[in-house]
Amino acid sequence: MELAQDVSILLRVAAAMLFGGVLGVEREMGKHAAGLRTHMLIAGAAALIVGLGDSVAEHFQQERYRDLLQVDPVRLIEAVVACVGFVAAGTILRGSREDQVSGLTTASSLIMAAAIGIAVGISKYVIAIGVSVLCVLVLAVMRRLEKKIS
């Protein structure tokens, strides 16, 4: 059972990295601070951390731990979001003028990559695929629309 669970987690991490890579390609083509590898690694890490939640919960359900610890899988998701928020904040730069801020879209795409990884980590593949497509549409199509407007 443990090997099957490990393989399942590994496959989810691979899928999350693939979906994160979809976002990363768009960022990479635009020469942004966080590109293909960063998005893939963040999505994969999110899926791994959430996927390991099952193993952690199972481990601590053993008789010797039951009275000592309670496992809350939501805390793993909170940890992913906090870590990614820290990394994403590093992509945001403020210019010399008060209205000059860059990197917000890249930071947002990193957070979405983590969310996609979380979705894959809990085997919500349809949601992960759908959100990946929506993100690419927002990143690619809306950029063209923004350029036409301004």
What do the predicted segments below correspond to?
Residues A14-M17, V84, S108, S132-V133:
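Residue-level signal for the membrane-embedded core of alpha-helical transmembrane segments
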Residues L41-G51, T105-A119:
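Small-residue-rich segments of transmembrane alpha-helices in multi-pass membrane proteins
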Residues G21-A33, V87-D99, V141-K147:
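C-terminal ends of transmembrane helices
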Residues R75-I92:
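Hydrophobic, membrane-facing alpha-helical anchors
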Residues V71-A79, Q100-G103:
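Internal alpha-helical transmembrane segments of multi-pass membrane proteins
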